[in-house]
Design a protein with these regions (language model features):
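A structural signal for small-residue-enriched, beta-sheet-centric alpha/beta enzyme cores
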Residues: 1-73, 77-80, 87-329
Length: 329
């Protein structure tokens, strides 16, 4: 039975770990076996790890997990915790007798969203990464969890969202996003989401499109300063993809951000989209089937971003950003 989560793609597991006192956390996408993946970076201030090897020209073909973390650059440590867990499972790229788990990742800035960030000498993200990997399952929570725990947007609390769909040929596409954008996911000051045209089964409230656009709908609104914002996402499919095909899916999926966030891809953001092909069946047509797959990936990602905001709950700290439910019920 479909969960409307990225884990509807067989072989994908997701784990979240967070620290309420810290106001930050980690989300890990674990693949049950190595997968082909690539990445597309559009934001002006990204923070990433091991994304260079996802270029189609590079040698390593399979990755074991992808990490999305809070904590800004400190959160890059989370991938080391995930590596440690994978190593315990005997996973990783084999070089003679050695195995090295391949774990790309990306981070978002939540250092000023509230919480106690005075963690001492070493940040806690390595342990949070390990715990998130250990918790990885087909079922997982949405909203203010994992990398979405401290996430915010221009006007509302952000969070972790996910969604899935199938192509006409029955290929499954799933997405997960940590919404921490400089822009807004809602139209002006209304309850309506920019992603409303793509919504399925009232998954983010069924509010639809406003009867008329409010006067402030297209007004520029933004949160924070350069380096403080980003939307991180992973799209996955049960089709077999080459690295070049995964790259094209990641590029096309970035349109999902444009459909769900206004404004987006600004110098203030660090937007990153990973794409992974998990199946053993190649696309029936390398051009048209890939075009449909990438188009659907954008739709699914737009839905996941809106769900992340819809499912979020406000943090308990003074001055914390209100959630969608706080404002609109």
């Amino acid at each position: 039975m479909a969960r409307n989560l990225i884990t509807d793609v067989p072989g994908v597991l997701v784990g979240n770990a967070g620290d309420a006192k810290l106001g930050s956390g980690v989300t890990v996408i674990v693949f049950e076996s190595p997968v082909t993946a690539s990445v597309d970076v559009r934001g002006g201030g990204p923070g990433t790890r091991e994304t260079a090897l996802l270029d189609p020209a590079q040698t390593v073909e399979g990755i074991d997990a992808i990490v999305l973390s809070g904590g800004s650059a400190f959160g890059l440590d989370a991938a080391s915790g995930v590596q440690a867990w994978l190593r315990e499972q005997g996973r990783g790229f084999q070089v003679r007798e050695a195995r090295v788990p391949i774990v790309p990742g990306a981070i978002l800035f939540d250092l000023l969203s509230g919480g106690d960030k005075n963690w001492g000498r070493y940040p806690p993200y390595r342990e949070l990464g390990y715990e998130a990997a250990k918790q990885a399952s087909v079922d997982f929570a949405l909203g203010s969890v994992g990398a979405g725990l401290g996430a915010t947007t221009a006007n509302l609390k952000g969070g972790i969202g996910s969604a899935s769909a199938k192509t006409r040929a029955g290929i499954t596409v799933g997405a997960i996003a940590a919404a921490n954008a400089a822009g807004s996911m809602t139209i002006g000051n209304t309850r309506h989401f920019w992603a409303a045209p793509f919504e399925q089964n009232a998954e983010f409230g069924g509010q639809g499109w406003p009867s008329s656009l409010p006067a402030d709908a297209l007004a520029f609104r933004s949160k924070g300063y350069p380096g403080e914002n980003t939307t991180l996402a992973v799209v996955a499919t049960d089709a077999k993809l080459t690295k070049a095909q995964a790259k094209r899916v990641a590029v096309m999926a970035q349109s999902g951000l444009s459909r769900a966030i206004h404004p987006v891809h600004t110098p203030l953001d660090g937007d990153v989209v990973f794409a992974a092909g998990i199946g053993t069946t190649s696309l029936p047509d390398p051009v048209f089937a890939l075009s449909e797959l990438g188009t659907l990936a954008a739709h699914v990602l737009a839905r996941a971003i809106a769900r992340g905001v819809y499912e979020a709950t406000a943090l308990s700290f003074a001055g914390a950003m209100p959630s969608w439910r706080d404002r609109f019920g």
